[in-house]
Amino acid sequence: MNLTNVDHIAIESSDIAKSVIWYKNNFRCKVKHQDSTWALLGFENIKIALVTPGQHPPHFAVVDKLVANKENKKTHRDGIHYVYEEDPDSNVIEKIDRGTS
């Protein structure tokens, strides 16, 4: 394991467009990506991913440069490798390898 930093926090949203407007108005964040199923909001030191229910579990993500070497890794549509793990209380942690992305 080679953790470097927290990358993002993912929370569910039943209406991505409505949530993006709310976060922009209340936190003045930047929209890095948005479509009908998810959005990525940029803050100074972290990102928030808004996802539709059932798409991904609510979680926080940490960068782990060794994820690409794991046999159980999956690949997001943007090419980033990831694995989900759960702590003893079933909280979900995503480990991602941003590589050169």
Task: Describe each model-derived feature in a short phrase.
Residues 3-6, 57:
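Hydrophobic residues on conserved beta-strands that form the core of alpha/beta folds
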Residues 7-10, 61:
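Residues embedded in well-ordered beta-strands within globular domains across many folds
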Residues 15-16, 55-101:
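Vicinal oxygen chelate
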Residues 4, 36, 78-80:
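Loop/turn position at the start of each blade in beta-propeller repeats
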Residues 1-4, 100-101:
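Short, Lys/Arg-enriched, disordered terminal segments
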Residues 46-50, 90-93:
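Short, charged/polar, Gly/Pro-enriched secondary-structure boundary elements
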Residues 1, 10-48:
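Core segments of cupin and vicinal oxygen chelate
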